[in-house]
């Protein structure tokens, strides 16, 4: 074995960086040009991916259980992950997004190839903390994913603003040195003709444009999922709750990769996506029957909102005599065009016009990172990084919707034309972390991050993670970190004004109507996230159990503290920092090689001990008490594989305590009982270049119909049949 420190003084093949980016171990052996080998010590970022709160979904996993449309459908099968709304209110109940460890979708940071994707932030933030959005996990088609990293707990804190719950990093397929291409077709057909069917087609092409020096990757995708029938829930239970809306996706994305030298690569990326909905009748408060002139009913099946997203990026990765570097510059623009909505009381979020308005969100990002292998007393890799982000929002329809001409509200004009439709924020950050091999089998990863927000000041986020081998097969792993989330651009905008004539006022306001204004004097939300776990690995057997706890404070909520009275006598409230909340639970996983290389059994489970706001006693979001995902994976022959998968969801409890005046004395105790979903699937490699797959989801046709009553906030689709074919070269 050659000396590592001496090797670092040589020009290294850039494959070292690629190996580190996909490492499954703490260290890797790399063969140098002269035939000798060296040990490359992993960075803190890669070592953190071995912590108990991290799961990896591979391209092969996606082939075995393909999502119908959105990647969230397979991400939800990881430990600690569920689909839910951002609050326990139940509004927008079928627009479920990724929730990690009960912290809510707004605390889940979505990345594509390591870069934040924040198009959902262009959608108006409601009084109860929900957005009419599908989230940001549907910008990449499943067939173009190389892997998905699901990062929970302390390991996620290094990513900064918005990662208090966790991080989803969607890694796309890279350019290749040889020409490769594929055309994929997929369809999903529900047995219930009131549920929406899906059709998808996409292609990808990658290869060299100038030998190994210049390579490219291009993909395109088109997908359509129909909306559920307008009366899918009404027919079952008489409710006006809407079913799942449909979506049309169109995506194109390209990457040029220039190998400047064997040690330096420059990537240039451009992407364009369009997502349009197929309206199913949702009105935020499920009261579409109150729509004036039957407008809501007349819009069923039409496109009422569409998002246009563009992203540009340039990234440089380098290997130097002293270590590795990465520098990137990125721009993301989202135009959110939708029919205008109400902003007052019970019609908040209800479409009230046939006129479209556009909200524009622009994000500018720059970041850089260096990794320095050191041998100061012990082997270690020091990481130093810096980030800068600017976000700019212009949403005239939401900021200027509420009209109270001639009224002054806590210094803010009630006249829409006098209120700004714009808001912006700048966040700068510095961070350092060190992957220290203190002893053989002992890794310690201290970290420190400082974020500075131009409106809300600075925030320190320290972290400490540990991995300790306990013999050859068992490891103890633990971590603690302080995570952080800045106020969003609606909460912090003085011009964002909502109102209610009384019923929507908090229940401590005994009488009168209310205004809710933005607040530029908020504190960032923080959470101290902790976990400790044991891991066993031997001869294909894997088992682990992890305890986690998040102590969450300063959660930003619609205010209950009366600031005074407006000139028209309305009570004035503003967005404010709430008290404390706590989330804790257990996660476990088990993999058993029943028949080596032929039949394996994989299981993971999550049990929520508690999830509640200490001020109100209500849960942060509605999620199952426990979730168990298990799969038998059978490699029948070299060409044929099949799987049987089963998911058990525990009971889901609603909010117990009224938060608004109209809820007092009328809270529903309706629970969703435990239920399970079974599916079967198969893949067959017909030829070297032709693969087919198919299966049945929800084999026993367990359906849930949304009632908008208590915890009954969403539809669980019934039995469906799917099939796909991929032709490649």
Q: Predicted regions span which residues?
A:
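Gram-negative outer-membrane beta-barrel transporters
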Residues: 184, 437-441, 547-552, 563-659, ...
């Amino acid at each position: 074995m050659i000396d590592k420190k001496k090797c670092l003084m040589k020009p290294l093949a850039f494959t070292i960086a690629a190996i580190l980016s996909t490492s499954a171990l703490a260290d890797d052996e790399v063969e140098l040009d002269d035939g000798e080998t060296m040990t490359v010590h992993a960075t803190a970022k890669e070592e953190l991916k071995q912590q108990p709160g991290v799961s990896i979904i591979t391209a092969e996993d996606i082939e075995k259980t393909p999502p119908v449309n959105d990647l969230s459908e397979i991400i939800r099968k990881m430990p600690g992950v569920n689909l839910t709304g951002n609050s326990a209110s139940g509004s927008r109940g079928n627009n479920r997004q990724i929730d990690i460890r009960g912290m809510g979708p707004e605390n889940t940071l979505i990345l594509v190839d390591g870069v934040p994707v924040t198009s959902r932030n262009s959608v108006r933030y409601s009084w109860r903390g929900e957005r009419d959005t599908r989230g940001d996990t549907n910008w990449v088609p499943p067939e173009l994913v190389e892997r998905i990293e699901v990062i929970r707990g302390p390991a996620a804190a290094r990513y900064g603003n918005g990662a208090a719950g966790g991080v989803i990093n969607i890694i796309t397929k890279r350019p290749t040195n040889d020409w490769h291409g594929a055309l994929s077709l997929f369809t999903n057909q529900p047995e219930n003709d009131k549920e929406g069917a899906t059709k998808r087609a996409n292609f990808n092409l990658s290869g060299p444009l100038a030998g190994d020096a210049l390579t490219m990757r291009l993909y395109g995708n088109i997908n359509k999922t129909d909306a559920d029938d307008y009366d899918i829930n009404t027919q079952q239970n008489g409710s006006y709750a809407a079913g799942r809306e449909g979506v049309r996706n169109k995506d194109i994305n390209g990457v040029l990769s220039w190998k400047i030298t064997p040690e330096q690569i420059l990537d240039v990326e451009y992407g364009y996506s369009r997502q349009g909905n197929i309206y199913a009748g949702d009105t935020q408060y499920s009261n579409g029957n109150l729509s004036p002139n039957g407008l809501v009913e007349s819009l069923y099946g039409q496109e009422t909102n569409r998002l246009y997203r563009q992203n540009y990026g340039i990234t440089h990765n380098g290997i130097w005599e002293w270590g590795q570097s990465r520098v990137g510059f990125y721009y993301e623009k989202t135009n959110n065009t939708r029919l205008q909505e109400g902003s007052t009381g019970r019609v908040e979020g209800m479409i009230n016009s046939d006129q479209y308005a556009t909200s524009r969100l622009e994000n500018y990002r720059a970041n850089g990172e260096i990794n320095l292998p050191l041998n100061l007393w012990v082997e270690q890799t020091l990481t130093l990084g810096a980030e800068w982000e600017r976000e700019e929002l212009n949403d005239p329809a939401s900021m200027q919707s509420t009209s109270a001409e001639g009224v002054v509200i806590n210094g803010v004009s009630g006249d829409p034309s006098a209120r700004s439709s714009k808001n912006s924020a700048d966040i700068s950050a510095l961070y350092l972390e060190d992957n220290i091999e203190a002893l053989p089998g002992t890794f310690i990863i201290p970290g420190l991050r400082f974020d500075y927000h131009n409106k809300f000041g600075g925030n320190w986020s320290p972290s400490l993670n540990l991995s300790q081998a306990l013999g050859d097969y068992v490891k103890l792993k633990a971590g603690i970190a302080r995570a952080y989330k800045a106020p969003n651009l609606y909460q912090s905008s003085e011009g964002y004004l909502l109102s209610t004539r009384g019923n929507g006022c908090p229940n401590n306001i005994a009488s009168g109507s209310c205004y809710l204004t933005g607040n530029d004097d908020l504190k960032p939300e923080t959470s101290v996230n902790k976990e400790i776990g044991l891991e066993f690995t031997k001869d294909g057997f894997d088992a682990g159990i992890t305890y986690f706890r998040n102590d969450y404070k300063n959660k930003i909520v619609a205010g209950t503290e009366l600031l005074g009275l407006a000139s028209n006598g309305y009570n004035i409230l503003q967005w404010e920092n709430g008290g404390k909340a706590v989330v804790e639970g257990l996660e476990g996983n088990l993999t058993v090689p029943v028949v080596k290389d032929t039949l394996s059994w994989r299981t993971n489970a999550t049990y929520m001990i508690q999830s509640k706001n200490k001020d109100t006693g209500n849960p942060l979001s509605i999620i199952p008490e426990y979730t168990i995902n298990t799969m038998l994976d059978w490699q029948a022959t070299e060409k044929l594989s099949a799987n049987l998968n089963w998911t058990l969801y525990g009971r889901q409890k609603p909010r117990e305590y009224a938060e608004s005046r109209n809820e007092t004395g009328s809270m529903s105790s309706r629970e969703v009982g435990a239920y399970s979903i079974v599916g079967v699937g198969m893949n067959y490699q017909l030829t070297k270049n032709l693969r087919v797959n198919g299966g049945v989801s929800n084999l026993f046709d367990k359906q849930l119909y949304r009632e908008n009553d208590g915890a009954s906030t969403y539809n669980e689709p019934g039995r469906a049949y799917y099939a796909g074919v991929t032709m490649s070269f």
